[in-house]
């Protein structure tokens, strides 16, 4: 226990930068948030201005302190969580970025990834980095900057440039250019990192022609990396002491630190992580193998899977079908009927991800009879989110041999009690919704607080990680399996819909 009273989590996301002030009981005291510019130079290209990322993040740090009326000497530490994979390259001597940040969503390096596949590197990349070959990850973005920005490759070869994901950039700026580090969770998303040896991979650097000198040092997610002071030079020095990529930070914020523990974040899509302990499991179902934290913030492993369309399907009901006026209405309409009347909605608007991996699948509504109405369609759309979650979690359990203990949940759609209850029913496990909804920030705060002695250990945190509500599954196994069988039948009929007839 220290005489400090607060931790600040910096939550640097894809559309906004946030600072979250937490007290010793892990309660949120104050939040500051600033949105920043999304830059779309061409179709499929997405960029951010690194200086704007820093400006919005540093201003929220100042603002959260000012709004709460606390002083810098009451702050024990700062933790960082960030949008993953987004890539920044800057000059070591001036701190000036040589190009905008290339965002995780950006598809500009598809030709580079196509060549990696054509050259036969898929299996090596899969086995070494745990990732699939895709423009999503940082490695090909770094190569693009070095190949396309005038003078960048020459400067990199001379040791004059630095690369970092957003966490690295923020630590470098917070410490006035003294510290160039990342953590294992962010390193594992670069496609340059060997997740087994926990080192930068020489062969990947050679394949992508990236000089080792630009890479940050890789450290644990919970340790003191350097110090900063709020509001410019002078003043109290505050340790920067925790780093984790956003999904791994959420896993830690839920205190899922042991094998078999999982979380699902319900946003536009869903991000699911299943902790697999010290086993790096190569998925047979197209899931990613990634690094997560153990109780001490040291690297262990997780399987990661995503659902493309979750909350977005409710927006579709609102914006395109116009059968709900507000996303919050979906629960009300779903409960106006006692079941879905045999209706299934497969929201494969952009294809289907794990475990189907079919880009040609398309959305469909099945099982319509004369008695089907709008309420049945709303109910079936909500149920589709839970069914897709079961699809991914079954793939995870199949790959890992781990039986899910319970599912911790966060994200906007978790406020929908009907959806959460149906999720428990269809998975046959308890679904736990936490009191503190800022789970990603909480993970970064926990990591920083443990590194600085603000909290003693995870046992102390367990008392603070309160569950607001537990949704327990219906005991009717026959009904559960009948419903899921119907879902699988509906999905089967949606597959390959957009594929041109080969005849």
Swiss-Prot record:
It comes from Haemophilus influenzae (strain PittGG). Sn-glycerol 3-phosphate binds at residues 14, 84-85, 136, 246. Inhibited by fructose 1,6-bisphosphate (FBP). It holds the Pfam family FGGY_N. GO terms for biological process: glycerol catabolic process; glycerol metabolic process; glycerol-3-phosphate metabolic process. Belongs to the FGGY kinase family. It comes from the Bacteria. It is an enzyme of class 2 (transferase). GO terms for cellular component: cytosol. The gene is glpK. Pathway: Polyol metabolism; glycerol degradation via glycerol kinase pathway; sn-glycerol 3-phosphate from glycerol: step 1/1. Key enzyme in the regulation of glycerol uptake and metabolism. Catalyzes the phosphorylation of glycerol to yield sn-glycerol 3-phosphate. This is Glycerol kinase.
């Amino acid at each position: 226990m220290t005489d400090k009273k607060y931790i600040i989590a910096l939550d640097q996301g894809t559309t906004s930068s946030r600072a979250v002030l937490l007290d010793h009981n892990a309660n949120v005291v104050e939040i500051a948030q600033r949105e920043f510019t999304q830059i779309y130079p061409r179709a499929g290209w997405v960029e951010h201005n690194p200086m704007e990322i820093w400006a919005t993040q540093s201003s929220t740090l100042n603002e959260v302190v000012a709004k709460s009326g606390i002083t810098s000497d009451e702050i024990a530490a700062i933790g960082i969580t960030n949008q993953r994979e987004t890539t920044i390259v800057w000059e070591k001597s001036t701190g000036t970025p040589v190009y905008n940040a290339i965002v995780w969503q950006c598809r500009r390096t598809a030709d580079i990834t196509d060549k990696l596949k054509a050259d036969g590197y898929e299996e090596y990349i899969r086995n070494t980095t745990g990732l699939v070959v895709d423009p999503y990850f940082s490695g090909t973005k770094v190569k693009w900057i070095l190949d396309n920005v005038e003078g960048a490759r020459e400067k990199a070869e001379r040791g004059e440039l630095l690369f970092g994901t957003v966490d690295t950039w923020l630590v470098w700026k917070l410490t006035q250019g003294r510290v160039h580090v990342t953590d294992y969770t962010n390193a594992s998303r670069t496609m340059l990192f060997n997740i087994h040896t926990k080192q930068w991979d020489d062969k990947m650097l050679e394949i992508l022609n990236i000089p080792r000198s630009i890479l940050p040092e890789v450290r644990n997610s919970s340790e003191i990396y350097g110090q900063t002071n709020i509001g410019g030079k002078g003043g109290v020095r505050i340790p920067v002491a925790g780093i984790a990529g956003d999904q791994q930070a959420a896993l830690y914020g839920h205190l899922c630190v042991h094998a078999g523990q999982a979380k699902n974040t319900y946003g536009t899509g869903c991000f699911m992580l299943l902790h697999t302990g010290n086993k790096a499991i190569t998925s047979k179902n197209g899931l990613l193998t990634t690094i997560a934290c153990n109780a001490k913030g040291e690297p262990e492993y997780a399987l990661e899977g995503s659902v493309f369309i979750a909350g977005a399907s409710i927006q579709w009901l609102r914006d395109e079908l116009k059968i709900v006026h507000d996303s919050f209405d979906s629960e009300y309409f779903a409960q106006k009927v006692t079941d879905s009347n045999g209706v299934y909605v497969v929201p494969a608007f952009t294809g289907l991800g794990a475990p189907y991996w079919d880009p040609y699948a398309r959305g469909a509504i099945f099982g319509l009879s004369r008695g089907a109405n709008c309420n049945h369609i709303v109910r079936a759309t909500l149920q589709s989110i839970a069914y897709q979650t079961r699809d991914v979690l079954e793939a995870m359990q199949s790959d890992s041999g781990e039986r899910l203990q319970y599912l911790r949940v966060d994200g906007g759609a978790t406020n929908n009690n009907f959806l959460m209850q149906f999720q428990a029913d269809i998975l046959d496990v308890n679904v736990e919704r936490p009191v503190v909804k800022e789970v990603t920030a909480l993970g970064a705060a926990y990591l920083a607080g443990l590194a600085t002695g603000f909290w003693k250990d995870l046992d102390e945190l367990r008392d603070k990680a309160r569950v607001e509500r537990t949704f327990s599954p219906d005991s009717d196994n026959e009904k559960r399996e009948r419903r899921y069988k119907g879902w699988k039948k509906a999905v089967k009929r949606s597959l390959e819909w957009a594929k041109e007839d080969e005849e």
